[in-house]
Regions:
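Conserved acidic/glycine
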Residues: 64-65, 69, 74-183
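Glycine-rich ThDP/TPP pyrophosphate-binding loop and its adjacent helix/strand module
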Residues: 1-113
């Protein structure tokens, strides 16, 4: 996901095959996005990597190893949503909501239009010194409405037609703007 964000992708998300409702929502949202959608899918393979993502899909471990990214909602996780993530500058930190030191109002509120925060989320599990310190995020990391190549191309063609007319291929080929290559 970090590579997709670094390549300036306009829709970046992650989902898993074992959660049919979530995968349907993410694929539908990616399909509706105007532009290219990059969606990482954690998919089990019974032959080559059976159970590789089970820590994120099993009912017993999923609540403590994953966090669902929902626009406008705080990043909470845990068996009873007792943990949350705060952002201090650009440094995320896991906090215990039962300690009394933090409330849900103190937590990081997910904003999928913030590229900087999306980059931070994409690296939650990449620190080898702190294995499973952060939960694995699932959902839409980043989305941006922006023009696409097709938009610009069609605009250019429409402008040329408006300025120069429809054009005539036969007139172009028979006109004086051609040349002959001789040996």
């Amino acid at each position: 996901l970090a590579v997709a964000l670094g390549a300036d992708a306009t829709f970046v998300a992650r989902t898993m095959d074992r959660d049919p409702i979530h995968i349907r929502e993410i694929l539908s949202e990616g399909n509706k996005h105007h532009g290219t959608s990059f969606i990482e899918i954690y998919q089990n393979c019974n032959v080559f990597n059976d159970g590789t993502f089970s820590v994120f899909t099993d009912k017993a471990t999923k609540p403590i190893t994953t966090v669902n990214l929902k626009e406008g909602e705080p990043l909470v996780f845990g068996a009873e949503n007792e943990k949350g993530i705060v952002l201090e500058g650009t440094n995320p930190r896991v906090v215990d909501l039962n300690s009394g030191d933090y409330a849900k109002d103190d937590l990081w509120i997910h904003d999928p239009t913030d590229r900087t925060k999306a980059n931070i989320l994409s690296r939650f599990f990449d620190d080898p010194r702190e294995e499973m310190h952060f939960p694995r995020p699932f959902g839409v990391f980043y989305k941006e409405d922006r023009f696409t190549y097709e938009d610009v191309l069609n605009e250019q063609v429409d402008k040329a037609r408006a300025d120069l007319g429809e054009g005539d291929l036969d007139a172009l080929l028979r006109g004086n703007n051609t040349w002959e290559i001789q040996e």
